[in-house]
Each structure stands twice: as C-alpha cells, then as structure tokens.
Amino acid sequence: MLLRILTFLAVCQVTTSHKILMFSPTASKSHMISQGRIADELANAGHEVVNFEPDFLNLTDKFVPCKKCRRWPVTGLNNYKFKKIQNGLSGDVFQQSSIWSKIFNTDSDPYQDEYTNMCEEMVTNKELIEKLKKEKFDAYFGEQIHLCGMGLAHLIGIKHRFWIASCTMSVSMRDSLGIPTPSSLIPFMSTLDATPAPFWQRAKNFVLQMAHIRDEYRDVVLTNDMFKKNFGSDFPCVEFLAKTSDLIFVSTDELLEIQAPTLSNVVHIGGLGLSSEGGGLDEKFVKIMEKGKGVILFSLGTIANTTNLPPTIMENLMKITQKFKDYEFIIKVDKFDRRSFDLAEGLSNVLVVDWVPQTAVLAHPRLKAFITHAGYNSLMESAYAGVPVILIPFMFDQPRNGRSVERKGWGILRDRFQLIKDPDAIEGAIKEILVNPTYQEKANRLKKLMRSKPQSASERLVKMTNWVLENDGVEELQYEGKHMDFFTFYNLDIIITAASIPVLIFIVLRISNISIITSSPKNKKD
C-alpha cells in the first residue's frame, strides 16, 4: 500500500490551485470557443476557472463553451440593439466604402457603444458585484474586443490580469503596449493590400493605422467616462489596466503570422485543444467523405450569416460546384437559410448543412480544400490538419489573415466581391488548389512544424500562468515604452526640434540680410 501511495505521489504534478475569472461575453460563438479552450486547459491544470458569460446574444442556454469550467451566465441584459447590430454585420460587408470615409469618419461605433451600455448595466448591478467580490479571484483573463472586463476586474479587486488577443494583435492593441507596427511591412487588418508595397499603398496603410488608433481611443475614452461616472474620477484608465497586464496571450500561432516586433511578455497560444478535438464523423458525413475524387468544404464561420448575404453569392457557388462534378461539396449555411437548401436540390455532389463537425472533416484524408472566410479558428484548424485553403475574407482581421496565408504559400486569396461579380475567379482558385501540388506540400510542412514544436500551446499557457501567479507577478517583463506618451515614445519632440533648427537659421539669416541691406550707405543716402 505504501509503495502505491509513493508511486501516485511521484507521478502527480504539485501545483498551487488558483481561482480564475474568464470574462467571456456571448458576443460571438467563435470567440466563446476560443475562450472556452483556454478555460478548459487551465481547469485541466488544476485551477478553478469560472467562465463569466454576460449574455449579449441570448446564447448561454444554447451553447456550451467549456467542459471543465464553472459557468456563470449573466442574463436579462438590455441587448436588443446589440443583437440587431450583430445581425446586420453580414449585409454591411458588401457595402463598399472609400478610404476617405474611413479616415474622416468621426462617428461613434454602434457596436462598441452598445457594448459599453451593457457593460454599465452589468457593473452597476451591486448584487452581482458583491457576489463576484466574495469569490476572491486570483486572476482575470479577458479579450481585447472591449475593455469592460478590465474595469470589472479592478472593481472586484483582482490583482493579476492576463490580456488575450483573440486573433492577430490589432494596431491599436500593439500601440497600447508600446509595440511598433511598421506600416511598410504589416498590412492594415481590414485591407487586402500586399506588402512590401509601393509608396501610395504604404501611405494608405499608415493613414488607416492612425485612423484605427484614433477610433479605438474614442471607444476607450467612452468606457473610461462610464467607469468614472459610476465609481469616481480616480478610477484608473481601462487602457492602463490592460497594458499593465502580467502577460498578453495571443490566440494565434507564430507560424501563421506576418512576422513583426514583439515583447517578452507576449505569448502565442494558438492551437489550444486541437490535438484533443476532431472525434468521429456520423454516418451522413462518413458517406460523403468517401465519394468522388475527394471533398471540398465551404464555410463562412459564425458571424457571416448566409441568410443576410446577397442571394447571388449562393447561386454562383452552386454553379461553381457543377464545374467539379467529380468532387463532393459540403456547404455550411445558416439554419434559417432555406433558399440555399432549395438551390442544392437535385445537385448530386452537394450537401448543404447548418452544422458541420469542422475539425473532424478537416482531419479527414480525403478533404482536398477548405473555402473559408479566414477567421482565425478556421485557419488554425486547417493548418493543424494540413489542408490548403481558399480565403474569402469578409471583415475584421480576416483580410490580413488571408494575406499572411497567401504569403506563406498554402492558400489562395480572393476578394469577397468576386463571389458576386467574378465567380470565375473562385472557380480558378479551386482548380489551382486541385492541380498544383505546391499548396498541399506547403500545408503539410506547416502541419509538421506546428505539431513538432518543442513546447505545445497548452504547456505555454499553463506554465506561464503558473509562473506568474506563483511569483506574485513578473514586473521584470513590463515594457517601459508603454508608460511613455505618444510624443516621447516616437521622439517627435526631437524630430520637430531638429527640423525647426534649419528653418530658424534660414529665418535669422533672412532677417539679418534684410537688416544689412536696409542699413547700407546707399540706402542711408537715399
């Protein structure tokens, strides 16, 4: 018996358990999935994880984001306007806007405004705040989408904060942290511009980055004003709370990123949970995966609702499938999109579904390509499975994700408007993926690199979290640049002074010259 006890103790990892608050509003299923993976990994490591779920889209009773955490839904929020804005995103992506409208648009962001309104409704709920305080959380985890959670963490007395980038870090997040974002190398997240780029594209990229920082600053000011109004003028700036987080976890993989400057306390954890996910396929999917020369999967994620997209898109897509009758197509649409189901009637090589076991389908050896919106969860799953992709970005970070994939050679990038105006371009991309083995070779290499890393995403997350909490923070990793103002950080005061000196010299010489001329003997005689 003693030998058994000693053996058991030998194989157990001694870890101090901490109570962690995971701030995970139901603003998007894909974000809830990403947050849920982090929560489960921390719970598996022995921590008590509470998944705090303000119900922005009435999803808490319809979707389970984590298996090992304790869920804490917050229902009854006034979310009507937020849901309306979210549902309208799909239709808005096909409204073209010029660069000038983005630069000179000083209107408020309805999405962020409603997020702030629901945040205020929640943090001013005294009963809820008291319950949260009694939990005595050791750490807070929250995304970059909105800084409500940072203010909440401070309000309930959480000392250690971990800031999560749910996708590639935006220029505004990088700016908050004091990380340079070279506009000559890194394309603005919502454009398809290539880099390195000619002069005018770099100029456009730079101006769009500055406009984005301006817009994000406006949203931060709005959130700050809300907290100060309710909790006093000495309430700290939520951006300061965010940028002084102990660690920044980025839910991406460095191998998929456009390489850029970074910091020692920025840790990539892309790929969490992928090795344990996948599972089996039910009979319906097993049958279709065995048909024809292979299978092509089409999905635009959870935000781009196919019901609200222009009808021409699905019509053109169905026509494209008939150009490849030797291949089977699995097309995932919104469950209310009855029109797409009707369009597929009579097409023997097309299966339209409102749900697909995506990781399992991607892992199947007969899947030939994935037509995707370039959302980061989908890209991670594709890369981990070694599947070439055709990227049709719609919004947010998706265009930059697509550009990164194209640059690394395992996918083909297309413009979303080609779904309407130039379906031949989509057809051509499918042909290229099927006949050119280079894309599969690049995807296989990426798969090998991701799976053979010296340290897994799970190990990075757990070990770095434990390291911070067991040492009561790691101030030594805090970057001094994040405390500097804009002028000092970029040495603008020095540049302006240096640029002013020649001008001052010119003015002095000019005045001196005029003075000499006017005081000459000839002028005196006159």
From Swiss-Prot:
Residues 1-17 form the signal peptide. It comes from the Eukaryota. It is a single-pass membrane protein. CDD domains: GT1_Gtf-like (cd03784). One of its GO terms (cellular component) is membrane. Its EC number is 2.4.1.17. The chain crosses the membrane at residues 489-509. Glycans are attached at residues 58, 305, 513. It is found in: Membrane. GO terms for molecular function: calmodulin binding; glucuronosyltransferase activity; UDP-glycosyltransferase activity. InterPro entries: UDP-glycosyltransferase (IPR050271), UDP_glucos_trans (IPR002213), UDP_glycos_trans_CS (IPR035595). It catalyses: glucuronate acceptor + UDP-alpha-D-glucuronate = acceptor beta-D-glucuronoside + UDP + H(+). It holds the Pfam family UDPGT. Keywords: Calmodulin-binding, Glycoprotein, Glycosyltransferase, Membrane, Signal, Transferase, Transmembrane, Transmembrane helix. Belongs to the UDP-glycosyltransferase family. Interacts with cmd-1 in the presence of Ca(2+). This is Putative UDP-glucuronosyltransferase ugt-48. It comes from Caenorhabditis elegans. The lineage of its organism: Eukaryota, Metazoa, Ecdysozoa, Nematoda, Chromadorea.
